């Protein structure tokens, strides 16, 4: 066991950057692999989620470039395959790598030797005793309340007089 990366703490969540070019630029400066730790080793990389796959692919490439013999990728959530309307700025399924790709296809796209996700059953089992509500909409497509008909960026681009949001206020 060892620390395989140095992380630039001043770079935030890369998947919420406005454009693909911004996401890739942020990923390049976010992490640096430590060759002396990973060279010649079988590495298990654990992450909270794969959203678009940009960070995942870059991170795995960094490990390989630093000499990792194998990279096995484990995700502590189910595949993020549906838009999140309640906190993550991902309004469209086309932006999500898990939409339209199998786990094996995602593994190939990100360049891992193996890929495993936590199942939705295990996630809900972990959260069952929580006093807070738990939304699985981005994993299952089943939301606790009706999903909005228009994305928030579209709502906020309109004058308030034209937005349906005004009716709810």
Enumerate the language-model features and the residues they cover.
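PRPP-associated nucleotide enzymes
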Residues: 1-169
């Amino acid at each position: 066991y060892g620390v395989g990366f140095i992380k630039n703490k001043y770079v935030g969540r890369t998947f919420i950057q406005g454009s693909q070019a911004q996401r890739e630029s942020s990923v390049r400066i976010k992490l640096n692999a430590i060759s002396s730790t990973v060279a010649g080793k079988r590495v298990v990389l654990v992450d909270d989620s794969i959203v678009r796959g940009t960070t995942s692919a870059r991170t795995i490439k960094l490990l390989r470039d630093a000499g990792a013999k194998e990279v096995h990728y484990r995700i502590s959530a189910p595949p993020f395959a549906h838009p999140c309307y309640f906190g993550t700025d991902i309004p469209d399924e086309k932006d999500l790598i898990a939409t339209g790709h199998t786990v094996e296809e995602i593994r190939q796209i990100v360049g891992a030797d193996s890929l495993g996700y936590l199942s939705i059953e295990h996630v809900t089992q972990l959260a069952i005793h929580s006093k807070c509500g738990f939304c699985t909409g981005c994993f299952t497509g089943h939301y606790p309340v009706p999903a909005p008909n228009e994305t928030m960026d579209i709502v906020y681009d309109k004058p308030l007089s034209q937005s349906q949001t005004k009716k709810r206020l």
